[in-house]
């Protein structure tokens, strides 16, 4: 599948969606986008910058939600213009979709809204690529129904994102078999390595996370075979306004991507025996 100006799929090197969880300021957005562009260009990785103007599903109303759609889109447009990278942001049921689609290159639907048929179809009707996050409560084989809803709009530029599965209270796990199962949809599969180690609501008024496990689950996913990675990153995750416990320090992402590139080449060189069994 051609996504923006590059090919994605299980037989192509992985692409990267990355950036801070939420847009904290114009300065941080430009700084992180510039850094990530340099790293990915040096490694030859196709890159889409991600950051949110509104986090609608925060644990507490005391948590920072974002700068709002107007200011958020202004900053994302500036990132596109000054840094020269494509941008992605997530949208919600009350989002002015056409306004967002006029700025961003790709939209993302939240995992909690994956079963909302009207929402999924309205997003896909905007005619730009959509990264659909699989619900934490959803079986891998059920995502095909969501893909069919998306395809009914005529939009075939759909990727599916695995972000972990609920496992008891405040815990997510990654069932790597699901990555293979979801490939049967024909959609490129993206693995969200940072939200997969989140501990939803685990800190009471905020979510916890195990950022030290990001490389672990990412290496496992690359062994199964994925088309892309989603990773949230920040210069100082402990000071981040949202999802700090599961974000990767930005100065560590280069090392992680190099490892994943090497493993990706080996996995895709030898093919996928499971497809013939």
Curated annotation (Swiss-Prot):
It is found in: Cytoplasm. One of its GO terms (biological process) is keto-3-deoxy-D-manno-octulosonic acid biosynthetic process. Keywords: Cytoplasm, Lipopolysaccharide biosynthesis, Transferase. GO terms for cellular component: cytoplasm. The keyword Transferase applies. The keyword Membrane does not apply. One of its GO terms (molecular function) is 3-deoxy-8-phosphooctulonate synthase activity. Pathway: Carbohydrate biosynthesis; 3-deoxy-D-manno-octulosonate biosynthesis; 3-deoxy-D-manno-octulosonate from D-ribulose 5-phosphate: step 2/3; Bacterial outer membrane biogenesis; lipopolysaccharide biosynthesis. Pfam families: DAHP_synth_1. Its EC number is 2.5.1.55. It is an enzyme of class 2 (transferase). It catalyses: D-arabinose 5-phosphate + phosphoenolpyruvate + H2O = 3-deoxy-alpha-D-manno-2-octulosonate-8-phosphate + phosphate. SUPFAM superfamilies: Aldolase. Its main location: cytoplasm. Belongs to the KdsA family. This is 2-dehydro-3-deoxyphosphooctonate aldolase. The gene is kdsA.
């Amino acid at each position: 599948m051609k996504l923006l100006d590059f090919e994605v799929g299980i037989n192509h090197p992985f692409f990267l969606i990355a950036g801070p969880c939420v847009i904290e300021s114009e300065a941080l957005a430009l700084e992180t986008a510039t850094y990530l562009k340099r790293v990915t260009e040096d490694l030859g990785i196709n890159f889409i910058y991600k950051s949110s103007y509104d986090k609608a599903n925060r644990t507490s109303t005391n948590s920072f939600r974002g700068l709002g759609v107007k200011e958020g889109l202004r900053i994302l447009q500036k990132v596109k213009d000054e840094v020269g990278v494509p941008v992605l942001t997530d949208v919600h049921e009350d989002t002015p979709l056409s306004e967002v689609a006029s700025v961003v290159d790709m939209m993302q639907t939240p995992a909690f809204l994956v079963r909302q048929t009207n929402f999924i179809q309205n997003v896909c009707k905007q005619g730009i690529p959509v990264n659909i996050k699989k619900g934490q409560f959803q079986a891998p084989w059920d995502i095909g129904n969501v893909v069919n809803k998306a395809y009914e709009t005529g939009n075939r530029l759909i990727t599916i994102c695995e972000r972990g599965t609920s496992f008891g209270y405040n815990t997510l796990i990654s069932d790597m078999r699901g990555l293979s199962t979801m490939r049967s949809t024909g959609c490129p599969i993206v693995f969200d390595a940072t939200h997969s180690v989140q501990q939803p609501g685990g800190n009471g008024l905020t979510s916890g996370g195990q950022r030290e496990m990001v490389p672990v689950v990412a290496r496992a996913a690359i062994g199964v075979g994925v088309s892309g990675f989603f990773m949230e990153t920040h210069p100082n995750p402990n000071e981040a306004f949202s999802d700090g416990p599961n974000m990767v320090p930005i100065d560590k992402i280069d090392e992680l991507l190099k490892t994943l590139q090497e493993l990706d080449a080996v996995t895709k060189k030898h093919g996928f025996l499971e497809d013939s069994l």
